[in-house]
């Protein structure tokens, strides 16, 4: 039984939201069944898990747009450090519906024509591919052979001043953990295939990360605000399994057993996050 349940989501349960709003229009705001409204709230998933497990402990949901999952992860780390519990279920999730896909495509977030996910990064154009997903982790402050990896450090930052500011924050983050970029076996970035946003990663790959093995992940899950949860799952399993899937590698060779992996992602160039994982 987890000692706490914490989730992060930017959109919440969109399918039920669309259903409820549609009924408001169709029924002229009269005689509306409340079920869809109740299930459309952002904390529905965390609440349903708690009800299923009969877990009456700390339960929280973070709705912080592009750093919703990281906020949940940070809250969990703080609870563990405070000794409130010794294991916490943490998850990041967002779903995509026909309605949300149509709206976000009109807003220019997604490409307006079909593109193979394996050709996402070679298709130089505006927009990315839509995605959705859910990834959950059981965090504990006790090391064991069952652990996938150790979450060494986490950092988020908002609207950096420019490329130099981003590089300073990354090097400062590593320095706080007594590391340099040369100590990192693999860097997983949130490259999305959108030329308006990938220039950040392009600049890093030729300057700060020029000697590092690089990997991408959004061609596997698509782009959505909490996709970093998928990246964390990918990184932790790469450390546990002592190998990196060839399908994610962009450049370089990785040690047979990567011991340190850095995950760097930004959403819309506004919300940035760094996650450092280490072998146990």
Question: Which ranges hold each PLM region?
Answer:
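Conserved active-site "lid/cap" helical segment
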Residues: 1-6, 10-16, 72-75, 165-185, ...
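Residues that mark the start of a beta-strand
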Residues: 2-4, 87, 258-260
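Short beta-strand segments
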Residues: 6-9, 63, 88-94, 263-266, ...
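Conserved catalytic cysteine-centered active-site region
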Residues: 12-75, 107-128, 202-233
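Short acidic, glycine/serine/threonine-rich loops at helix termini
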Residues: 16-19, 99-104, 199-200, 273-276
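Active-site-proximal alpha-helical scaffold in enzymes
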Residues: 42, 50-52, 61-92, 132-145, ...
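Acyl-CoA/ACP chain-elongation machinery
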Residues: 86-88, 92-106, 125, 152-163, ...
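Condensing-enzyme catalytic core mediating Claisen C-C bond formation in acyl metabolism
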Residues: 106-181, 185-186, 211, 258-260, ...
């Amino acid at each position: 039984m987890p000692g706490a349940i914490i989730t992060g989501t930017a959109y919440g349960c969109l399918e039920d939201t669309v259903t409820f709003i549609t009924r408001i229009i169709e029924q002229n705001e009269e005689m509306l069944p409340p079920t869809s409204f109740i299930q459309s709230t952002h904390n529905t998933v965390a609440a349903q898990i708690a009800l299923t497990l009969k877990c009456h402990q700390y339960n929280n949901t973070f709705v912080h747009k592009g750093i919703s999952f990281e906020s949940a992860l940070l809250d969990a780390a703080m609870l563990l450090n405070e000794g409130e519990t010794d294991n916490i279920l943490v998850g990041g999730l967002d779903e995509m519906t026909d309605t949300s896909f149509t709206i976000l495509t009109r807003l220019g977030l997604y490409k307006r024509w079909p593109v193979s996910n394996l050709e996402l990064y070679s298709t130089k154009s505006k927009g990315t591919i839509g995605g959705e997903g859910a990834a959950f982790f059981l965090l504990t402050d006790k090391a064991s052979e069952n652990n996938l990896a150790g979450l060494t450090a986490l950092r988020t930052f908002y609207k950096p001043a420019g490329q130099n500011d981003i590089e300073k924050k990354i090097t400062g983050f590593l320095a706080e953990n007594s590391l340099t970029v040369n100590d990192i076996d693999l860097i997983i970035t949130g490259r999305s295939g959108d030329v308006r946003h990938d220039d950040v990663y392009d600049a890093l790959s030729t300057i700060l990360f020029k000697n590092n093995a690089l990997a991408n992940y959004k061609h596997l899950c698509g782009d959505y605000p909490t996709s970093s949860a998928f990246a964390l799952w990918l990184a932790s399993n790469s450390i546990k399994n002592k190998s990196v899937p060839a399908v994610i590698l962009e450049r370089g060779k990785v040690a047979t057993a990567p011991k340190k992996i850095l995950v760097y992602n930004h959403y819309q160039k506004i919300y940035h996050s760094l996650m450092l994982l280490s072998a146990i």
